[in-house]
Amino acid sequence: MPLLDRVREYVVRHGMLEPGDRVIVAVSGGPDSLALTHVLYRLAPAWRLSLHLFHLDHGLRGEASRADAAFVADLARELSLPLTTVTLRPGELEAMRGSLEDNARRRRYAEMARLAAAIGAQRAATGHNRNDQAETVLMRLLRGSGSTGLAGIPPVRREGGLTIIRPLLGASRQEILAYCRAHGLTPRMDATNLQGDFERNRIRLEILPALTERFGDAVVDNLAQTADLLREEDRLLAELTREACARCGWRETGEATGEPVVELDGTLLVQEPLALARRIVRMAVQRVSGSAYGPGLSAVTRALELAGRTEGSHWLDLPQGVRLSVAYGRCRFARSHPQLGPGAEALEQVWPVAVPGETAIPALGVTVAAELVPPSAMPARLPDDEMWLDRDRLPGPLAVRTRRPGDRLWPAGMQGSKKLQDILVDAKVPRDQRDGLPLLVAGDTVVWVPGVIRDRRFRPDAGTRSAVRVTVRRRPEGSGGD
């Protein structure tokens, strides 16, 4: 089926467009966005569409980024379409919290939402294709995602007040490249897409080709089909979850203060089928945090273990700056706030650190940001609030806790190890502050005491293949959420 007909059929099947819609088209200059623009331009007269091109110049590739912007400007002039280009300052994405990929994505959608509000657009179209879908499913499978994650990229979704549509999601990358050749379209090629620095690129360049070579060309279609099937089943699970929420006495409050709170009966929650109970916890965290992403399996499991307690009062800090409080079987999910100092329970807790991602730890008054970075980018001198680690040398997953008896580190300039207690005394850390210090650990090994000492064994060197940059920031008193 010709690409134009395939896109037309896909758009109709998923209800992506209405006659007379004003549509923002995200254009990078690559083959996907170029084909998307060309196809929508051809479909526009029949549906009376008003197209408005959008380009985000990330400023990450110097002259190549400027050439991309100029290419898109030429395309807009050739098609007589309006264009909005947003140019970011050098280092702007790197300064944001989270990974570079996630930051670029969030900024792109935020800018498109602003543009939509300014021009009255109803939709924004992006060039995601069937290969992107397969890569997403594979990436999330390797991360251990559930059905929601494995449902992949949705054809239509609401994001930040804007409806995002993906008209090319039913087409393969090969079809798109063939379309560009057939219509004399010469796209820009982003060299970073050919580098193995990012997780998705490794899947695109190494893992998926190896699977295709071993199991045939149907691998991409089969992975994308899996996403389609799971998306339908996920819709059913979502409906069953809403019914289970009602059975558990789900109640939302706090809208007037801008700090949403979810309350429910924990004794009823733990009686639900495990699949539904997990989804209820994830939904509660998403409602309170406002994030599209829920907590991982480990955090959800700990939340359910706590929710079933019927004696006394307990609490647990979850990702996205949400705290679960349980009092005699009643659960309350709310924004977490820093305390004046950690209590006895906080001193016994361990907070897993999301990599990449950001973890708020109100009990210790800190926020921990972690991202994967190229080892070669490490500066000669690190700020006091920053730590770089050789990912392959870490003895376990990263987490934050307070000190424990027997903690030791290997300081720079010393042959062996030294007790943390002695290190804190030598550093003149006040006695009343020592128990509340946040420690970055890998497994049960202390790798960093922010502002005090770093363990030399995990510092990246010439042989490092993958590095993690961790930043610890103090949270202003009274702040909440993320």
UniProtKB/Swiss-Prot annotation:
The keyword Cytoplasm applies. GO terms for biological process: tRNA modification. InterPro entries: Lysidine-tRNA-synth_C, Rossmann-like_a/b/a_fold, TilS/TtcA_N, tRNA_Ile_lys_synt, tRNA_Ile_lys_synt_N. GO terms for cellular component: cytoplasm. The N-terminal region contains the highly conserved SGGXDS motif, predicted to be a P-loop motif involved in ATP binding. Ligates lysine onto the cytidine present at position 34 of the AUA codon-specific tRNA(Ile) that contains the anticodon CAU, in an ATP-dependent manner. Cytidine is converted to lysidine, thus changing the amino acid specificity of the tRNA from methionine to isoleucine. This is tRNA(Ile)-lysidine synthase. It comes from Symbiobacterium thermophilum (strain DSM 24528 / JCM 14929 / IAM 14863 / T). The gene is tilS.
